[in-house]
């Protein structure tokens, strides 16, 4: 179900839901705003019949309104926009987020093309690129840790690894790779 964000009452409901959680839990420092549901049956019970063709514009405006209100109310919370799945990534949205997640596909080989494509339009440093496990849980592909770090250094480096499952050699390599990334981050 996709909420009808062309409706100001729905916008207020979404804003208040997020705002109340953050207000009541001041220890929350990070929020990933996931947008994994595409609109498959567009229409609005709020918009008049002769404005149904405006749903995409009004939905977008409503979503941006919610983003703005949440950010204005919680300027110290770090927000990540997730476009994996629903494709919700544009400059209008990005101005309310420090970073974005370009795809739920974390296979390093496939991420090369995904990240390259994203970098043609959006700033690389805002693109979250994580080192994930090998074999990859989506493709089953086994890739060396160095390759996974090299690919993840194309944007904002992160790790989707459990350090407790890494051997000593991998931990040492990861620490060195992170130091290398920190020395080149200003170039990214």
Language-model features and meaning:
Residues 160-188:
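Glycan-recognition and catalytic regions of carbohydrate-active enzymes
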């Amino acid at each position: 179900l996709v909420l009808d964000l062309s409706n100001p009452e729905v916008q207020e409901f979404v804003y208040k839901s997020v705002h109340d959680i953050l207000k009541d839990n001041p220890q929350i420092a990070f929020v990933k705003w996931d947008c994994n549901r595409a609109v498959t049956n567009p229409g609005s019970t709020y918009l008049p019949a002769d404005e149904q063709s405006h749903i995409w514009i009004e939905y977008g405006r409503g979503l941006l309104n919610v983003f703005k209100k949440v950010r204005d109310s919680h300027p110290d919370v770090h927000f990540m926009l997730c476009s994996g799945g629903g494709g919700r990534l544009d400059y209008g949205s990005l101005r309310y987020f420090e970073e974005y997640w370009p795809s739920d596909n974390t296979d390093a080989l496939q991420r090369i093309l995904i990240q390259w494509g994203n970098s043609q339009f959006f700033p690389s440093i805002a693109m979250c690129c994580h080192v994930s496990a090998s074999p990859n849980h989506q493709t089953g592909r086994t890739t060396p840790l160095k390759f996974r770090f090299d690919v993840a250094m194309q944007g904002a480096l992160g790790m989707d690894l459990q350090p407790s499952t890494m051997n000593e050699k991998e931990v040492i390599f990861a620490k060195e790779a992170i130091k290398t990334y920190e020395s080149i981050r200003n170039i990214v």
